[in-house]
Amino acid sequence: MYQENYEDEEFAGNIDVVADSYVNSNGHDEGDYEDDEHLQQQAQAGAQAIPEQVRKFLGHLYRNLLSSNVSDLAYNYENQFGRLSEKYYAKASWPEPQFVAALVGDDGLFLTLYRELYYRHMYSQLHPTLEARFRSFENYCDLFNYILNSDGPLELELPNQWLWDIVDEFIYQFQSFCTHRSWLNKRSAEEIELLKANPQVWNTYSVLNVLYSLIQKSSITQQLVAAQDGADAAALAAGEFGARPLYKMLGYFSIVGLVRVHCMLGDYTLALQTLENVDLNNSRGLFTRVTACHVTVYYYVGFAYMMLGRYADATQAFVHILTFVARTKHYHQRAGQFDSVNKKAEQMYALLASCVSLCPTRVDEMVHSALREKYADQQHKVQRGGDEAVEILSELFRFASPKFITPNPPNYDAPEETVVEPQDFQLKVFLREAKLQLVVPMLRSFLKLYTTMDLAQLAAVLDVGADELRTQLMVYKLRYRQVKWAGGADLLGGEVVPTTDLDFALQQDMIFIAESRVGRRYADWFIRNTNKMQDLINSLETRQKNFIAGVGKPEPAAETKA
């Protein structure tokens, strides 16, 4: 498991180091062709070939960027870009950046942002070549160098959704490149030489450097600390750069991005430490401004807790965000975001099924109903223990876990060497803890049927020896209590509390069982179903009003002739 800690000061300052052009195998650079008349003619022809609707979109996007019209930019980005992608570029890339340059007067900033969209679409719909992966990294370096290395704050303003997507896509492409690089047996000799000659491209240090630099430049950590103390964060801690929404939100989203990267590397303790100044109890926190960011925070927090064996905290995190998703699913207007949120929700249901099976606890009834519908059979099998339980936990983990990466490149001189898949390694880490925990649901299912029971009788039921049963009971006792987060900034801290409703005492060969029953919350059930009924009544009343207003208004009867 990757455990190296990166401190903020290690990544301070200029990040020009990550922006070096990579060495292409043919020895040429893009600048060699800038004055080529033939290429200029091709660019003009390519610009004319762009569909009229797309050219209008690019023109509006360019003008709104120049005028810092954030609301119109948000509409262009969140609605029009997706619709045009589906209409014209469902199975093709967007127009080449050099063709678009002719439409916007070679504006460098706009073209850098356009390339970010261009490569993002390529990653989502096509199979990017190694050359495209290198170019995309180079473009991100240009963008982040422009933002971080300016003498003063930029006047640039972008919608929060776009800023989040920039950070999120940057990390996704890093993960994708690491996976692509590790499969040397699928790479050609030329590609291997290109990878070997460019170790700085999508380097782990470079990616962490960018995220830490954005955090430092925005002073977002100081702003969050000041906000917890009740101070005016913007005035006291933001500084010249952090007062601008561009830097503030990029810095904040980079904190969430770091949580994701640390989980991908397998350092779950550092992932939770990264969020020490983020108040997850604040329903108006900055992470709630973008739904995808909100879901991402709780997904990785819950996953980190699960990998640390804190199943009660993981359950709490998953239930919180799944409840939010269930209650707001009708308000997601953007199809792309709706699909990604739903996909992540399905993964969290699988992880929640594992956590609740290993550490039985009560959850919100709405989430419990959905969980039972999706994974009732798997949960039942896990609670019985045995090899079948391990197999099911493995399947759920492979489906729902994030994509792990190996931070170091493979041995390019020996491509035939077998490399341990990081996904398999992290699965072993999870199962090592889960196998010890399996005794809890198995014993609980038998003990809850009795108030007292003879040790030999239970051993006969379980078909194990008395000594082995004593060992299992001691394991249950140890697993019965866990550290549980009690709120506050320290996600790693908490109180040692019981995590299940059943305890026991062993005296000689007699087991005395005590179960703490929690009364059913009937009020919640009535309130929820009353709200559903009210929504149904409102919907019917609206339809009735529309019908009366003219939709179903009867036509006047025609006069009959005598």
Predicted regions and their residues:
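Extended alpha-helical scaffold regions
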Residues: 1-562
